[in-house]
Amino acid sequence: MDDILSQDEVDALLKGMGGGDVETEGDDTSGGQSAKVYDFTNQERIVRGRLPALDIINERFARGFQRHFNEMIMASVEVTAGEVKIIKMIDYLRNLFVPTSLNIYRINPLNGVSLFTLDSKLIFTAVDIYFGGTGLLPFKIEGREYTPVEMSMVRSILDISSENMRKAWGPVMDIEIEYMHSEMNPKFAGIVDPTDMIVVSPINVRFEGVEGRVDIVMPYAMLEPVRD
């Protein structure tokens, strides 16, 4: 028996499908699982892969920061760029100690604001070495404010950070760093909504026997120019 339909049979079948007289595979929704609805505006679904251009920027920043930081504290310090992390703002803030030097900046012409985070270990060690110490004295990160001397060190570190950030971005685009304000308590330093995704670029600063860190924190949406 010939399994090929005649043209009249094909026409009748198409007419039945269009009018609903003939069931199609897509008509049967019983017994199957319902379709999942995806929110394509959810950043967690669209954040994928690495940011190779940002890795290069961070390497440039680390080299420049090392040179200037060595000159500033008159000691040998090794500075390296760590692995970039993409996480929620709330997850980043909840893991910070108090006090932490949290400094909010604009990076013009990029949209939004960014965060330069200096951990207290970096600040305390740099101050000790600057005044002739070894940087190896034990210290406790307490819930206290920074001293005037420690704040002066923070400002000096921020100055060289801003300059080297501008130079590191130079081959990609011209930027200007605009300081806005500083905080010590993480709950006052959210630069985006708590559940928004941020990009954390850790810069590791190794003294002899001690390690501190600078984090450059930017909203994921800010980095459109360097995603490709």
Where are these regions (language model features)?
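N-terminal auxiliary interaction/assembly segments of multi-subunit proteins
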Residues: 1-228
